[in-house]
Amino acid sequence: MRCRREFIKIFGSAAVLSSARIATPLFTGSESDQGNALRARLASDPLRPQYHLLPAKNWMNDPNGPIYWKGFYHMFFQYNPGAAVWGDMHWAHAVSPDMIHWRHLPLALAPSPDGADADGCFTGSAVDDHGTATIIYTGVKTSAPEEATLRDGVHTFREVQCLATSSDVELRTWAKCKQPILQPPNDPRLTGFRDPFLWREGNIWYLGIGAGFRKEGGCVLLYRSRDLRQWQYLHPLATGKWTGHESVNPVDSGEMWECPDFFPLGTKHVLLYSTAGSVIWEVGELDSKELIFHVQKRGILDHGAYYAQKTQLDSHGNRILWGWIPEKRPEAEFSAAGWAGCVSLPRLLSIGVDGDLEMRVASVANSLRAKTFVLPQHHVAVSERGSTLKAIHFDNVCGELAWKTKAAASTFKLEDRAGTWWSLHCELQGSTTKLNVNGVSVDSPATSKAEREFHLFLDASVAELICDRKHAITTRIYRKPDGPLRLVLDDSNLAQITSLQAWQLRAISSDRLTS
């Protein structure tokens, strides 16, 4: 799996560094005819998602600072206003009444030419500081190699933590503190210092930052403060292990943790982070006196095209997970397309009876359902390829499928006239079930449950699958279906299906969020 730093290394030299100012719209009123033509082309691009959040154009990556504020959900995300490749990181901004239906607002944060964030406003978090909306984010600026904390073979960035506040209801305008609120440790072994997250206990704020040390491993550095501006370093909240392999990018070798997040869930605490090609979840206990996290269970958050995880509380106090769905096609293709990346659907997190982290797409996504397809099991035609259920035509490939099966081994395909478009193959191997989704292979321990549960969301080139609320596999499909999609199952599996439902889903805008 390609990590975020690899995107920086590959695309950084091609990035367009602009001097865009805060509150610049994604499309400006002075745009040329060429720009209007781009908007029209993006609005009709069959590979561009229709109900996932994404910018009007160009590149996006990490979701940043999701927050429920004054009755609305605000999502910020890493954005390049100048091109559909990584570079010149700003904070784009969108707002929603329900975490599903989004509209774009002006850019929230832009690099300050003479500031500590001159080369980018990187990932961060948003919190309510006694009635004041406050963002803490990582600012980066090119520096001498000996002062840099991010070294990827292309850049030598010094990473510091910066703060900005907003006083308007829609969080349209932000005022930055003139100076960084936190400098990195003076340690030559440091592999990074970015992606802050926060929580509060009483009058004390705690700040965690993704970091690591060469030939030791990634970690979360823990700080505390009473005012979000003066910080005291405590110790690592959690630490990992180096893989033992040398790498130019310390994320690849487990020597750096990106995008950490930490929060209570039920009676446990959960730590999320990305390192060594995986997005990791850990469930355990927080020692409230020593402020050290002790891991009890560990797993993979999503096995596919998913990175830069971020959580928030919804209006009911539920823990909601977001992630960046990156492109899986060559740079030349998505650069020419004029857009890259989107935000995942909101996933509701919980702790299972076995102590594992569980997830499902939040029920607010039900508002997308426009039509229910009737799929009785007797509507089956036997073919050489297996049992074919009644064909489903998802307009613009906006659809949802949910099914349950008693079969330990099974195959579930979506086919068009050209062949297999999306497939899931489950094979029992001893005490393990091997799941294969469009070439992505996942090992799933055998379950004592009488049936397995699958939930699939299709949106143009995006497919989000969750199995048994434990295994998420997000994939990209860069081929428009040739005609209606047919559901194809093994003959032996058909009788084992206990439930099968399908819905046509609505687009959340008339122009694929290009305005």
Cite the ranges covered by each PLM segment.
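Secretory targeting signals
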Residues: M1-R2
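Short beta-strand or tight-loop elements
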Residues: F122, R194, E258, Y307, ...
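Beta-rich accessory regions
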Residues: D287-L291, Q296-G304, Q312-S515
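Beta-rich carbohydrate-recognition and catalytic domains
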Residues: L26-D195, R200-D252, W257-C259, P264-H303, ...
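N-terminal export signals
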Residues: E6-T28
